[in-house]
Amino acid sequence: MNYFQLFNIEVSFDVDLQQLSSSYQTLQKTVHPDKFAHASEQEQRIAVQKSAQINDAYQTLKNPLQRAEYILVQRSVEMPNEQHSFQDTSFLMRQMELREMLEDVRHSGDVDAALLEVQSVLSTEYLQLSQVMRTQISENNAASNSAACDNLRKLKFYQKLNIEVDRLEDSLFDD
């Protein structure tokens, strides 16, 4: 089952989230387990399975990074696991710089300003990289798909670092 076909939307990194949500609600109404309360046990089980598949598809397409990964997997792009090291030394250096920047927030004289700076840098770099990956996915050739895969891993790093920023902010301001 192709998730894009299921929701009758074009395969693209950019998805109309309102259309996706509308299609999701329509599909869920047709297979909702409550509709099958008086059906046979097998029909109930099938309805539950279809409902779960629709939920999985919706959650995947709703999230930009999961959507990108899904597109690349559908194109048979080999996705390295999280433990596979980056070959991009400049990005490895950038990771260290960003982590140092985050650590410096704790020792900053103006924690608010330092946090805003980190958040701004992460947001800007995430958006720029996202735009590059969007273009690579739309090109859909071996080289662009491979590059999109590398950029997806970088975007996942930014996403995780943003979570760390949120945790740091919570810990600094909960005291």
Curated annotation (Swiss-Prot):
InterPro entries: DnaJ_domain (IPR001623), HscB (IPR004640), HscB_C_sf (IPR036386), HscB_oligo_C (IPR009073), J_dom_sf (IPR036869). SMART domains: DnaJ (SM00271). GO terms for molecular function: ATPase activator activity; protein-folding chaperone binding. Residues 2-74 form the J domain. Keywords: Chaperone. Pfam families: DnaJ, HSCB_C. GO terms for cellular component: iron-sulfur cluster transfer complex. The keyword Metal-binding does not apply. GO terms for biological process: [2Fe-2S] cluster assembly; protein complex oligomerization; protein folding. Interacts with HscA and stimulates its ATPase activity. Co-chaperone involved in the maturation of iron-sulfur cluster-containing proteins. Seems to help targeting proteins to be folded toward HscA. Belongs to the HscB family. This is Co-chaperone protein HscB homolog. The gene is hscB.
